[in-house]
């Protein structure tokens, strides 16, 4: 089998194609969630706590000196990314819950399987022993 043919078969398998579609949709969904957090959720939240923009929260470790830029920890951006993560995680959780619910087949009551020959014989022996004990 040629290398190209083998690669084509690998790439066209259902799992690989499904994964590729999932990654592309996931990336697009991530952009939507980031916009939701940055443009919809964070501004009112900042307004509620005094008109603060979370992106501006930062802690300067070292001031800029000449050509050397300042060393700054932007923890406001981190807080915003935590909100992104929580929303994405919740959305994925809800999607998986929905998929599991749709995939769950109604369990039909199954009849008890017929007893095996061994079980039938053991039941007969048990019944005979009970009869003998009751006679005594």
Swiss-Prot record:
Keywords from the named record: Cell inner membrane, Cell membrane, Ion channel, Ion transport, Membrane, Transmembrane, Transmembrane helix, Transport
Location in or out of the cell: Cell inner membrane
GO molecular function (one): mechanosensitive monoatomic ion channel activity
Membrane-traversing stretches: 10-30, 76-96
Membrane topology: Multi-pass membrane protein
PROSITE patterns from the UniProt entry: MSCL (PS01327)
Pfam families: MscL (PF01741)
Domain of life according to the entry: Bacteria
Gene Ontology annotations for the cellular component aspect, listed alphabetically: plasma membrane
Main location: membrane
UniProt key word Membrane: yes
PANTHER family: LARGE-CONDUCTANCE MECHANOSENSITIVE CHANNEL, MECHANOSENSITIVE CHANNEL MSCL
Quaternary state and interactors: Homopentamer.
Entry-linked NCBIfam families: mscL (TIGR00220), PRK00567.1-1 (NF001841), PRK00567.1-4 (NF001843)
Protein family: Belongs to the MscL family.
Function of the protein: Channel that opens in response to stretch forces in the membrane lipid bilayer. May participate in the regulation of osmotic pressure changes within the cell.
Protein name: Large-conductance mechanosensitive channel
Species the sequence originates in: Citrobacter koseri (strain ATCC BAA-895 / CDC 4225-83 / SGSC4696)
């Amino acid at each position: 089998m040629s290398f190209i043919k083998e690669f084509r078969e690998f790439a066209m398998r259902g799992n690989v194609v499904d994964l590729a579609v999932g990654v592309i949709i996931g990336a697009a969904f991530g952009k939507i969630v980031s916009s939701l957090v940055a443009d919809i959720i964070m501004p009112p939240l900042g307004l509620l706590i005094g008109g603060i923009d979370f992106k501006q929260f930062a802690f300067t470790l070292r001031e800029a000196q000449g050509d050397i830029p300042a060393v700054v920890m932007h923890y406001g951006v981190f807080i915003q990314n935590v909100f992104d993560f929580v929303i994405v995680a919740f959305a994925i959780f809800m999607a998986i819950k929905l998929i599991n619910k749709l995939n769950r087949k109604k369990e039909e009551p199954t009849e008890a399987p017929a007893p095996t020959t061994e079980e039938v014989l053991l039941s007969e022996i048990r019944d005979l022993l009970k009869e003998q004990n009751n006679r005594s």
